[in-house]
């Protein structure tokens, strides 16, 4: 019984990474850009219907909802070879098309105005599923639509579908560069509050680290958006392989999430992928064994989140799930796990078992690959809190001077005061404190002392 997943793509960033994700899924399942199954794609071992459904004329349509407050990106998708893939009824563009002006408050209050139209689409998709498992939301936390409308949708999805899982792929801004969005720290913090309170699982895609990986590992001087988005779509498709090529374990979303998230608030995951290649660099083929792949996944340079070095806190893994694709002998996996434990290659929490799990998955039979084995690590690691700390520091700088707040004051939510900003700051601080507490043996009783 397939547990379907509906993908919601929001704003410029969400629609761009979503577009790459669907391109990747079509290639892996042998589906043409028009949604027709290719003649060679006859092996019936994959499960397409988690992410696609079939129209009356047999062609496959993504269970995707494309939302944006300005038309540019969605128009470029509709002018691409993949225009006929999507269900046109599932595309929502706001009528005035002015966007959210990189302003969280504008995105949020536009969400309030248009939520009926949006939920008509989402409810229709949900009703068309046999047993909907949940939603996947793609967005960035820095702009206006992805952050503001994204926050609004996260709150409403919890109200309307309290039993459904909500997983997000959230793109964090590049902190090495000056941002062209001056209110980015406000947008990020307001969105982080919703990601903490309203999502079950957040896969953090950190632009700082993605740019670093593209430069250092793939040797691209100035990585373009599309190259970074290709990295992201690799992670997104790899993290869903066990759903699409089901094995015995981890063949639904809750199985993936349950093994990684033992305590509900600490649900921000980082990812690592190896071996990384872009099209040109396939020449650099190394031997890939399971141990190689698993050891490389633990190296910080392959992890797609840039975490600051925090000497005071002894950061550690809460849980790891490695999704290994390719020709793998299961006994090798067991040996590799033993080696990792014996050599203490990973530092785990002091208050629970060293949870490192491995899910084996088939590779797509239709895509040539230069590597026998590739791996994706999804890890719950306490050092992700340093990403939130730097968001808070940037926010505090602006908030202290009350900089750029007049753009927010125009919207109802901030008309009288800025309590919502301060509340968000508190929620994120509590999240940081809990991640720090999770590095100590007494975390089990954490939260009971304070009440």
UniProtKB/Swiss-Prot annotation:
* InterPro entries in the cross-refs: Gamma_tubulin, Tub_FtsZ_C, Tubulin, Tubulin/FtsZ-like_C, Tubulin/FtsZ_2-layer-sand-dom, Tubulin/FtsZ_GTPase_sf, Tubulin_C, Tubulin_CS
Looking up Pfam families in the UniProt record yields: Tubulin (PF00091), Tubulin_C (PF03953)
* Record localization: Cytoplasm, Cytoskeleton, Microtubule organizing center, Centrosome
Highest taxon above the source species: Eukaryota
In the record, Phosphoserine modifications are located at 131
Q: Which SUPFAM superfamilies match?
A: Tubulin C-terminal domain-like, Tubulin nucleotide-binding domain-like
User: How does it get modified after it is made?
Assistant: Phosphorylation at Ser-131 by BRSK1 regulates centrosome duplication, possibly by mediating relocation of gamma-tubulin and its associated proteins from the cytoplasm to the centrosome.
Q: Which UniProt keywords apply?
A: Cytoplasm, Cytoskeleton, GTP-binding, Microtubule, Nucleotide-binding, Phosphoprotein
Q: Name one GO cellular component term.
A: cytoplasmic microtubule
Entry keyword annotation includes Cytoplasm:
yes
Which SMART domains does the protein's record reference? Tubulin, Tubulin_C
Q: Which residues form a coiled coil?
A: none
Q: Which residues bind GTP?
A: 142-148
GO molecular function, one example?
GTP binding
Main localization category: cytoplasm
Q: Which GO terms describe its biological process?
A: cytoplasmic microtubule organization; meiotic spindle organization; microtubule nucleation; mitotic cell cycle; mitotic sister chromatid segregation; mitotic spindle organization
Q: Which family does it belong to?
A: Belongs to the tubulin family.
Assembly and partners are described as: Component of the gamma-tubulin ring complex (gTuRC) consisting of TUBGCP2, TUBGCP3, TUBGCP4, TUBGCP5 and TUBGCP6 and gamma-tubulin TUBG1 or TUBG2. TUBGCP2, TUBGCP3, TUBGCP4, TUBGCP5 and TUBGCP6 assemble in a 5:5:2:1:1 stoichiometry; each is associated with a gamma-tubulin, thereby arranging 14 gamma-tubulins in a helical manner. Gamma-tubulin at the first position is blocked by TUBGCP3 at the last position, allowing 13 protafilaments to grow into a microtubule. Interacts with alpha-beta tubulin heterodimers; the interaction allows microtubules to nucleate from the gTuRC.
| Function, in words | Tubulin is the major constituent of microtubules, protein filaments consisting of alpha- and beta-tubulin heterodimers. Gamma-tubulin is a key component of the gamma-tubulin ring complex (gTuRC) which mediates microtubule nucleation. The gTuRC regulates the minus-end nucleation of alpha-beta tubulin heterodimers that grow into microtubule protafilaments, a critical step in centrosome duplication and spindle formation.
Q: What is this protein called?
A: Tubulin gamma-2 chain
Species of provenance? Bos taurus
Give the gene symbol. TUBG2
């Amino acid at each position: 019984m397939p547990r379907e997943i509906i993908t919601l793509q929001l704003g410029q960033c969400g629609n761009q990474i979503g577009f790459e994700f669907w391109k990747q899924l079509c290639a892996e399942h042998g589906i043409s850009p028009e949604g027709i199954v290719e003649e060679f794609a006859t092996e019936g071992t994959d499960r397409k219907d988690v992410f696609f459904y079939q129209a009356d004329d047999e062609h496959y349509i993504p269970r995707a909802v494309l939302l944006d407050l300005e038309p540019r990106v969605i128009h470029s998708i509709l002018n691409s070879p993949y225009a006929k893939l999507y269900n046109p009824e599932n595309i929502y563009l706001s009528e005035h098309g002015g966007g959210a002006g990189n302003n969280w408050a504008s995105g949020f209050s536009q969400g309030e105005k248009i939520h009926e139209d949006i939920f008509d689409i989402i409810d229709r998709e949900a009703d068309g599923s046999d047993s909907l498992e949940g939603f996947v939301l793609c967005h960035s936390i820095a702009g206006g639509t992805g952050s503001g409308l994204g926050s609004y949708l996260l709150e409403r999805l919890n109200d309307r579908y309290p039993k459904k899982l909500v997983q997000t792929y959230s793109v964090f801004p590049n902190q090495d560069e000056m941002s062209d969005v001056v209110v980015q720290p406000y947008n990020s913090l307001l969105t982080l509050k919703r990601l903490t309170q309203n999502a079950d699982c957040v896969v953090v895609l950190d632009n700082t680290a993605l740019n670093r990986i593209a430069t250092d590992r793939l040797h691209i001087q100035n990585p373009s958006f599309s190259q970074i988005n290709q990295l992201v779509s690799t992670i997104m498709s790899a993290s869903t392989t066990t759903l699409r090529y089901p094995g015995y374990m981890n063949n639904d979303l809750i199985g993936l999430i349950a093994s990684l998230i033992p305590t509900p608030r600490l649900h921000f995951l980082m990812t690592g992928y190896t071996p990384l290649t872009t099209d040109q660099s396939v020449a650099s083929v190394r031997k890939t064994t399971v141990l190689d792949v698993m050891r490389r996944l633990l190296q910080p340079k392959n992890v797609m989140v840039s975490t600051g070095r925090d000497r005071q806190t002894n950061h550690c893994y809460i849980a790891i799930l490695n999704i290994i694709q390719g020709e793998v002998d299961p006994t090798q996996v067991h040996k590799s796990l033993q080696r990792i434990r014996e050599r203490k290659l990973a530092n785990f929490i002091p208050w629970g078992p060293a949870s490192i799990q491995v899910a084996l998955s088939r590779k797509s039979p239709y895509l040539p690959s230069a590597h026998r084995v590739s791996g994706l690590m999804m890890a719950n690691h306490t050092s992700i809190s340093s990403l939130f700390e730097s968001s808070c520091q940037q926010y505090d700088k602006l908030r202290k001077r009350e900089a750029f707040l007049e753009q927010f004051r125009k919207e109802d939510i901030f008309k009288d005061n800025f309590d919502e900003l301060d509340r968000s700051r508190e929620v994120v601080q509590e999240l940081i404190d809990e991640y720090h507490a999770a590095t100590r043996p007494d975390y089990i009783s954490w939260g009971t002392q304070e009440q």
